């Protein structure tokens, strides 16, 4: 897990992908809806509906990790300073997307004062490679190597964004102002086009030529329209779509199940199950259960299964 520190405080907001609707605690012991928490999480009552993507709304030391996402980015935004940080990596290799903070309360503020003289509160924007939750361990054999790439990218102007890559960041968000859109360049964008369309319709609501240097942005608002689901697409000079976003349509899905403790060794009836539980306990150095109880159970079930 990479662990960059990002400025916390009243203006901080986590930028999780739009398809993240649930988050887990360490070891998936607890779960919460996201970004609007509606239950109890870390013994805090959020039943009124609280946006836990905002630092100021999380009173106690709290971790949360995205249950899953099909997007390749995660980030943080500071509303006070019009700037933020994005992490970009292939989500098939880097599924872990996490935030941790000391909490916006007397306890957390005491830690802020102890850990820094002048810099104030921070959050940990953590990103997991080959792991979607902590703790999560695996084996690395002799002469084995695992390779990965990840990128940390500053950005400004756009605020909360809906997709990002190594080349660009896009925004498409409805608000009281209208349909807010934006594009931020990480690589030079010459001869590109940015288009916004209603899905299923040919005519574009916006179709503009783009010429942006790195660290520059364009943005705007579409007024007076209320279309159905929209898509925003950034295309290169050859017409290839290099980054896109289709408006996420929230669904009333049940929260995922939290992790459950395995059966005791004597209650296991499958040699494979006994083996995998034992291996898991061995990898995680479990404090109260011995992997050898499960290995011995597997041998007792079938001494010839090896």
Descriptions of predicted regions:
Residues 1, 143, 150, 179-183:
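Buried hydrophobic-core signal for structured, non-transmembrane domains
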Residues 2-145, 153:
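A contiguous, surface-exposed recognition patch within enzymatic or periplasmic domains that forms
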Residues 3, 7-12, 161-162, 191-195:
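Short, hydrophobic/aromatic beta-strand segments
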Residues 133-134, 261-264, 294:
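Active-site-adjacent structural elements in folded domains
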Residues 144-157, 235-236:
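Short, hydrophobic/aromatic-enriched beta-strand segments in well-ordered soluble domains
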Residues 162-269:
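Long, contiguous interaction/recruitment modules in multidomain scaffold/adaptor proteins
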Residues 267-301:
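Alpha-helical segment of the N-proximal tetratricopeptide repeat
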Residues 305-306:
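Residue-level recognition of tetratricopeptide repeat
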């Amino acid at each position: 897990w990479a662990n960059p520190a990002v400025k916390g405080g009243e203006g901080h907001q986590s930028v999780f992908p739009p398809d993240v609707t649930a988050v887990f605690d360490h070891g998936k012991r607890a779960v919460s809806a996201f970004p609007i928490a509606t239950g109890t999480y870390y013994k805090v009552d959020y039943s009124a509906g609280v946006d836990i993507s905002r630092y100021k709304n999380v009173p106690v030391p709290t971790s949360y990790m995205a249950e899953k996402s099909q997007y390749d980015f995660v980030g943080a935004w500071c509303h006070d300073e019009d700037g933020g940080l994005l992490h970009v990596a292939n989500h098939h290799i880097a599924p872990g997307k996490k935030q941790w903070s000391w909490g916006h309360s007397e306890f957390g503020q005491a830690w802020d004062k102890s850990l820094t003289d002048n810099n104030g509160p921070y959050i940990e924007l953590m990103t997991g490679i080959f792991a979607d939750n902590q703790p999560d361990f695996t084996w690395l054999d002799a002469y084995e190597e695992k390779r990965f790439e990840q990128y940390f990218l500053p950005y400004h102007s756009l605020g909360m964004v809906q997709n990002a890559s190594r080349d660009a960041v896009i925004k498409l968000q409805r608000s009281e102002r209208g349909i807010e859109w934006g594009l931020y360049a990480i690589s030079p964008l010459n001869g590109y086009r940015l288009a916004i369309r209603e899905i299923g319709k040919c005519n574009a609501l916006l179709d503009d030529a783009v010429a942006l240097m790195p660290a520059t942005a364009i943005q705007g608002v579409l007024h007076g329209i209320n279309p159905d689901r929209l898509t925003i697409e950034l295309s290169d000079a050859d017409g290839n779509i290099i980054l896109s976003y289709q408006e996420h349509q929230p669904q009333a899905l049940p929260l995922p199940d939290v992790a459950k403790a395995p059966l005791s060794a004597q209650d296991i009836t499958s040699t494979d199950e006994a083996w995998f539980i034992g291996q898991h306990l061995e990898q995680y150095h479990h404090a109260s259960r011995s992997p050898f109880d499960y290995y011995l159970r597997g041998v007792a079930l079938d001494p010839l299964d090896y």
